[in-house]
From Swiss-Prot:
Presence of the UniProt keyword Lyase in the record: yes
HAMAP family in alphabetical order: UbiD_YclC
Residue numbers annotated as active site: 273 (proton donor)
Record protein name field: Phenolic acid decarboxylase
Keywords from the UniProt entry: Aromatic hydrocarbons catabolism, Decarboxylase, Detoxification, Flavoprotein, FMN, Lyase, Manganese, Metal-binding
Record's function text: Involved in the non-oxidative decarboxylation and detoxification of phenolic derivatives under both aerobic and anaerobic conditions. Phenolic acid decarboxylase that catalyzes the reversible decarboxylation of vanillate.
A GO MF label: metal ion binding
Amino acid sequence: MAYDDLRSFLDTLEKEGQLLRITDEVLPEPDLAAAANATGRIGENAPALHFDNVKGFTDARIAMNVHGSWANHALALGLPKNTPVKEQVEEFARRWDAFPVAPERREEAPWRENTQEGEDVDLFSVLPLFRLNDGDGGFYLDKAAVVSRDPEDRDDFGKQNVGTYRIQVIGTNRLAFHPAMHDVAQHLRKAEEKGEDLPIAITLGNDPVMAIVAGMPMAYDQSEYEMAGALRGAPAPIATAPLTGFDVPWGSEVVIEGVIESRKRRIEGPFGEFTGHYSGGRRMPVIRVERVSYRHEPVFESLYLGMPWNECDYLVGPNTCVPLLKQLRAEFPEVQAVNAMYTHGLMVIISTAKRYGGFAKAVGMRAMTTPHGLGYVAQVILVDEDVDPFNLPQVMWAMSAKVNPKDDVVVIPNLSVLELAPAAQPAGISSKMIIDATTPVAPDVRGNFSTPAKDLPETAEWAARLQRLIAARV
């Protein structure tokens, strides 16, 4: 099932028992964030949370942990809620192959129901803002899909970026913006080189697939809307934003339009990040908000970030695994699977066959130089093709049985990494590491690896038989 907006997805979550409505009065701080944080501590099938009785707010509707379980992630893709995570990743990869699917332009977007413009813009009157961690420097929009265009090629649909970035509210019509090292940063650099402001649209409360693709590491000229269509199995609905003329999701709850002011900076942060650590305050670009459009009684969606696991890890797990898999397979068809579930792919586990000795290390180095790897992928573990990278006991076995640190651990100094990586020194620069836990092949003949003790041929048949017998007994 393809969802056109957040509300229809929340309805499905409720029908599937994956939405918990909390009607008792709660405090905006610390209750909202603490409740969302708690979902990551009660198991892999925790529900989304909906609050409609928040002290100090009039008529607020707040949704959290919308993608925060494998059950919810499966439902977002239109799969049964009990679909195992590895099958979700495999289905994600199959749908990727349908890319591109052209979007469907629609009129009468629901977010056109209400408007604030110019001096009347007051974000505090529209959004029920609260801090997510007690050390945050202010209020954040952290689950927005931000739309920008390449100033040198404004009409190229593929170069129109839709991405998730952290945004601090610093005034009624001012935002501090952290572009990280992604596509919007390139757009901003090009605009500032010309001395121009960069138009921008910030969309809040989007359909569940749009939220997934906005955090997906895609090539610069690949359209997130066309990828959303592939994942949905139907064209993604878009509409034209009235001020910028940008293509924005048709079903958003709120659309904020304005400009990133050229060469202006303000202190942004600190903010508790997906790394499980705060990133300190830095001078960041400033957005001047010129128009806000929003639905009647908008649902404000927010994303808790902190020590894993939490919603962020479910949201950006599969959508990081699959692009890396596709990019690596384009050059190394021997690659079998990629597990990039951990901290948005700062660590990656790759299973691969080998053409010859040293081949696995080459795959690891290529992973570090993919579009996503340049800013993330700081540690790569390589395992044989018969080791499941999603099965951590198998991975630990491969590392313990096959790794000789002298020959199988490679450390490469002074490579790029995103500034938010807490281990970077200085910010944006880090050593990176490859651990080759594969079995050596000629001409690499190190070690004493006899014929491996593999599963008996009948094991898979017996596993299925035992599962049937157990199910029948229950």
